[in-house]
Amino acid sequence: MKFVDEALIKVEAGKGGNGCLSFRREKFIPRGGPDGGDGGDGGSIYFEASSDLNTLIDFRYTRQYKAENGQSGMGGNCTGKKGEDLTIKVPVGTMVYDADTGELLADISQPGVPVLIAQGGFHGLGNTRYKSSVNRSPRQTTPGSSGESRNLRLELRVLADVGLLGLPNAGKSTLIRAVSSSKAKVADYPFTTLHPGLGVVRVSPYKSFVMADIPGLIEGAAQGAGLGHRFLKHLSRTCVLLHVIDIAPLDGSDPVADAKAILNELTQYNPDLLNKPRWLVLNKIDMLPDEKEREEKIQSIIKGLEWKDKVFSISAIETKGTQELCYALMQLIDEMKESEA
């Protein structure tokens, strides 16, 4: 299925039903009083997160959503039927913005919890409501009010505990395949990953976390180059970022310069991302079989980046070092969630 993480739609809540103008006209009550009933409220529009959805593609084909209008009141003091509410299912992690003002209306991250987006119109009042001691035959009613109408911008931000950063072909997709049940596409060319992918990493029968793989970044991504700039927003909800570096690139490029280019793109896009815990993952150590050469390369990268946080040396394709990495991630995530509780 095509991955779509942005959509523009219009929603319109139902109009309230009009109040009824009516008088009792029965065989033995020739001059009966007013009996016009109120209208029904218009249907409201709710958004609800569903774990079964992972893309906004449905909103590319259906762009207008309208709730049911309330029915008008009737004689005999009968109230009009309320318009049926409309509940729109969206993926977990959907942000709902007012497209005209840019205001964030809702961050829908709890499955099964309806969130009101557009309020239905209020019902009109029948003439019975206006009966008084000085006005026994009121001919006054009120119409139902219009429901709220909004132009919306939907933005999906995937919910993941761990985000993978790196240049194309750094081995991010290979890593997520190695440690989870994800079937991310892997090939020996840049931009194999075209949209964010999620993998559930299970470290024990009762402990797991979610890892997100986004398309590789290139220099100038913050200004729109490559593919990754569209998906940097998906890293905003993560607890920790893994900076994946190819320790022995086949094109002979400098891993330190490559890593600095990625950090520069993060700084330009959103400096707050740099405040998250970031661990360095040096991948493809299998490409340097000589232990001394490998250790010298690792130390030169750490020194060149002036890296102070945790460093893991792994071979994703051979799953070397991946278990230790996953256990350390689970421990950090547990600690962060406990501190937030």
UniProtKB/Swiss-Prot annotation:
It is an enzyme of class 3 (hydrolase). InterPro entries: G_OBG, GTP-bd, GTP-bd_Obg/CgtA, GTP1-OBG_CS, GTP1_OBG_dom, GTP1_OBG_dom_sf, OBG_GTPase, P-loop_NTPase. HAMAP family: GTPase_Obg. Its cofactor is Mg(2+). Residues 160-334 form the OBG-type G domain. The keyword Metal-binding applies. This is GTPase Obg. GO terms for molecular function: GTP binding; GTPase activity; magnesium ion binding.
